[in-house]
Amino acid sequence: IALNNADVNGTKVAPFANSRDFFYGSWFTTDEDWMGKFISSETRDPLPGILGYNNAVLMENSPNKTLACDGALNYINAYRTAVPVPASACEWFLPSLRELADLVDVVSTVNTKIAAAGGEELIENGGNGSRYWSSNERPGNSYVVYQHNLVSGGISTPYRSAGSTAGVFRMMLAF
């Protein structure tokens, strides 16, 4: 997990997108060159694994990216620019619900390690600052992208474009 939340022009809490009527995670199912190469981001309970990376690739290549996930991509790209990764790792990505859920039981331990490394602890104080955007979209509802609350362990389904349900972008990478 990244040592700090992503930041764009001094802002760390933001909406996922500027529009809410588009999906980014299923376009590949009808594209002959991409068909069968990914798992749809439109799922709440993904298979175990590093699906945040899968979902980030779907976002980056989506024909709807300027509407469906522009905010998220701005934060992903800003973090990638600001924080280089080791040659043995993939690029930074926005975690899936599963990857965020895996943090809930170990958040205190993770925070201790992050603090020791001089990073920004995962927020556990409630409010928008503890709602972390996932890279999972809600099936059948183009308005919604899932968030994970590290305080309650709960999952919420806010509108991707509503400022009142803005969340934090915390990146991960895999070796």
Residue ranges and their predicted role:
Residues 1-82, 130-132, 162-172:
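Extracellular adhesion/carbohydrate-recognition regions
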Residues 88:
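Conserved P-loop
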Residues 91:
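Mobile, glycine-rich extracellular loop/lid and propeptide segments
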Residues 97-175:
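C-terminal, surface-exposed recognition/capping segments
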